[in-house]
């Protein structure tokens, strides 16, 4: 079924992990941060271009730079309190 690889030393283990990681081929032109998917790069680059527009939670007043972060906050934090 599956072959099990035994890696004896730390250097070889780190090398194996590095090779198994997906390549980050998409690079932000503003800060050089790397991404594996073009969509993630596009969302990230918006944080550099956009003015300081903020989205606030109506329940607790916390501010967010991105609307999707506010949406996540509402789902996981604020509504349950």
Swiss-Prot record:
It comes from the Eukaryota. GO terms for cellular component: nucleus. The keyword Zinc-finger applies. SMART domains: ZnF_C2H2. Transmembrane segments: none annotated. Keywords: Developmental protein, DNA-binding, Metal-binding, Nucleus, Pair-rule protein, Repeat, Transcription, Transcription regulation, Zinc, Zinc-finger. The keyword Glycosyltransferase does not apply. Pfam families: zf-C2H2. GO terms for biological process: periodic partitioning by pair rule gene. It is found in: Nucleus. Putative transcription factor. May function redundantly with odd and sob in leg joint formation during the larval stages, acting downstream of Notch activation. This is Protein drumstick. It comes from Anopheles gambiae (African malaria mosquito). The gene is drm.
